[in-house]
A protein has these predicted regions:
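Adenosine-nucleotide cofactor-binding segment
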Residues: 1-53
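Glycine-rich phosphate-binding loop and adjacent beta-alpha segment
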Residues: 3, 9, 45-115, 119-122, ...
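Structural motif
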Residues: 16, 40-41, 62-63, 140-141
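C-terminal capping/lid region of NAD(P)-dependent oxidoreductase domains
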Residues: 36, 111-115, 127-145
Length: 145
């Protein structure tokens, strides 16, 4: 959502970067980058406000993991693209403790590490929420207590 975030993603090893704010039709850009094959996997954080572009960007038989709903909880699902691309849309939420431990163990097997943007003390919880709502973060916002 900003050139600064794109620069940080590039520093982490990203090959292709698209600012969805300056390129609202980013699904077509993904198609161009991939030679009109589409992306294998899309991590969809925006929710209904960006979901249609995720369907434009995903390849036939691809996977869209809905892991965030920054633009709201309800909205239009482009069923014609879901069906014609035979794509899979999966909603994901943080599960119970065992699932989280399994997830952390799987992450530990990978070379990449989660990016922690900022850590707040529990007493500053309102500040953490304001920071989240600002959209200025790149990576995770953590609260210690």
């Amino acid at each position: 959502s900003s050139d600064e975030k794109l620069a940080r993603a590039r520093a982490l090893g990203a090959d292709h970067l698209i600012n969805y704010r300056t390129t609202p039709a980013w699904g077509a850009t993904v198609q161009d980058i991939t030679g009109h094959r589409g992306a294998d996997i899309i991590l969809e954080l925006g929710g209904p406000g960006t979901l249609s572009q995720s369907f434009e960007a995903v390849r036939v038989g691809g996977h869209i993991a809905l892991i965030g709903v920054l633009t709201g909880f309800e909205g239009h699902v482009p069923t014609h693209l879901l069906m014609s691309k035979q794509a899979r849309l999966q909603g994901l939420v943080v599960g119970h403790r065992r699932q989280q431990q399994d997830y952390v163990n799987a992450l530990n097997l990978q070379a990449s590490r989660p990016v922690i943007d900022k850590v707040f003390d529990f007493a500053a919880l309102p500040d953490a929420f304001r920071y989240l709502q600002s959209g200025a973060h790149f990576g995770k916002i953590c609260v210690e207590w």
